[in-house]
Design a protein with these regions (language model features):
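Sec/Tat signal peptide C-region and signal peptidase I cleavage site
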Residues: 32-37
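A short, amphipathic edge element
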Residues: 41, 72-73, 149-160, 206-211
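Gly/Pro-enriched, hydrophobic low-complexity segments
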Residues: 94, 105, 116-120, 126-131, ...
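Short, solvent-exposed mixed-charge patches
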Residues: 263-264
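N-terminal mature ectodomain segment of secretory-pathway/periplasmic proteins
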Residues: 39-122
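Short, ordered beta-strand-loop transition motifs
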Residues: 81-87, 161-170, 220-221
Length: 264
């Protein structure tokens, strides 16, 4: 479920940063009869269709990261695309000058859950590939990891409906890849439009690590799209918030717009 689709410009407060955001945009609604019982797998497949409806998009987002009064601001350009079993993302800092040109790109093969990621530091003048656990480290000091920035695909996990109320389905998802950094994820999926409203991430010890709350949505071409979200580190109390100010969808993008060459 991508928190981010398309090109995104982010203005960030207190970031050592999305993403997720980017990734984080919400998408197409599938109508389901209230009387029809659905499994956890079906609910998450429908949520995946909503949160990943648009194959690409362009947005501007204000992003704030930090704790208390210690906050910084960043302008970040995000480009994402999905289709044919692949998800691609590129993120480049534009402001302030101290981080201008710093970039990150990642590509995920959904079927194999294989990911390649790279970072570009202008001060070094070269692209560096992120290996193994480096992809799960903090995205430039934010409360998102590099892998969080793109978001997850429903096919990466198994899903169980563990409860519901008048407003939400409660889903527990377990990664299929035993090497995944998370042991499980708890979702709240809105019954009204199949959007994901909350995700709690658990570490390998089963401890709640952080929580993503998707606060506001708006309709774009009749589809609910994320406006505001907050990622909270439940250990440190640090918070990263993302507030979108504009967006374009269905932007034509190509493979050469992503990857290590596109970062330079």
């Amino acid at each position: 479920m991508s928190v981010f689709g398309g090109i995104v410009m982010l203005r960030v407060n207190n970031l050592s940063i999305h993403m997720a955001f980017m990734g984080v945009m919400a998408f197409a609604l599938m109508a389901v009869s209230p009387a029809q019982a659905r499994s956890g797998e079906e609910i998450m497949q429908e949520a995946n269709a909503v949160m990943g409806f648009f194959p690409s998009a362009v947005a501007e987002v204000n992003l704030t990261t930090g704790k208390g009064n210690k906050k910084r601001e960043r302008l970040l350009r995000l480009v994402s695309k999905q289709g044919d079993g692949r998800r691609q993302l590129i993120a480049t800092f534009r402001e302030p000058a101290s981080v201008r040109g710093v970039g990150f790109s990642t590509e995920l093969d959904v079927a194999t859950d294989k990911r390649q990621s790279w970072v570009y530091l202008p001060s070094l003048g070269r692209v560096r590939e992120l290996k193994g656990g480096q992809q799960h480290e903090s995205f430039f000091g934010s409360d998102f990891s590099y892998s969080d920035l793109m978001g997850r695909d429903a096919a990466q996990d198994t899903h169980k409906l563990v409860g519901e109320d008048a407003v939400y389905f409660n889903i527990t998802s377990t990664p299929k890849n035993s090497a995944d950094i998370y042991s499980k994820l708890d979702y709240k999926v809105a019954k009204s439009d199949n959007t994901i409203r909350e995700i709690t991430f658990y570490n390998r010890k089963g401890q709640a690590l952080k929580r993503l709350t998707n606060i506001d949505f708006e309709k774009v071409d009749g589809v609910p799209v994320l406006l505001n979200s907050v990622m909270e580190n439940l250990k440190s109390g640090s918070v990263t918030s993302l507030n979108r100010t504009s967006m374009q969808v269905a932007i034509e993008l190509f493979d050469y717009d992503f990857g290590p060459e596109a970062l330079q």
